[in-house]
Amino acid sequence: MSVPQTKAELLLAIDKNFSKLIHYLNSIPSEMTSDDSMEGHAKGTEMSVRDLVSYLLGWNSLVVKWITFDAKGQSVDFPETGYKWNQLGLLAQKFYQDYSALSYDSLIAELQTVKNEIVQLINERTDDVLYGKPWYTKWTMGRMISFNTSSPYANANGRLRKWAKNKNISLK
């Protein structure tokens, strides 16, 4: 799927990639979700399916935070307070830790909830607000949302397919 350029395309990309993601996540046996055998987000690391969901949940929560802060006229620390763009591996580790106490089913439910919040925030905005002007450096709000929702969902789908193939797990 190409990079979304409109609100409708963004919503479609999120829905398509998230639906596939949820299907895959629900196909994985629960006893396999904590196995650190998937290529990690930081070079040379491995992570579990739980970590992958925590990563997505963390980034989706940041999207909600960014948009909410912006709507209130508050300054936004991109990507997150205390982190720079060259520290995304550390931020991934923070996300894994932040959600480590949640069960796998709770992680998926929380991801669904925060994704729904993002969809609501998108629906409350016009194409012009989402794509009409730069929001963070040269990137529009819509592009920043895509960078942290539909694109990572698609990436996660690829990671899960590769991991499942290596583990002889059917994601059908």
PLM-predicted stretches and their roles:
Residues 1-24:
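Extreme N-terminal tail/first-helix region
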Residues 3-7, 42, 97-101, 138-142:
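A short, mixed-charge helix-start or loop-turn motif at secondary-structure junctions
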Residues 7, 11-14, 49, 107-111, ...:
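Hydrophobic packing residues in well-ordered alpha-helices of helical domains and bundles
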Residues 17-24, 59-62, 114-117, 121, ...:
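Amphipathic, well-ordered alpha-helical segments in soluble domains
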Residues 27-43:
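Short secondary-structure junction/hinge motifs that connect adjacent elements
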Residues 38-86, 90, 124, 129-172:
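Short, contiguous alpha-helical
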Residues 84-129:
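Acidic/histidine-rich alpha-helical segments that form the ligand environment
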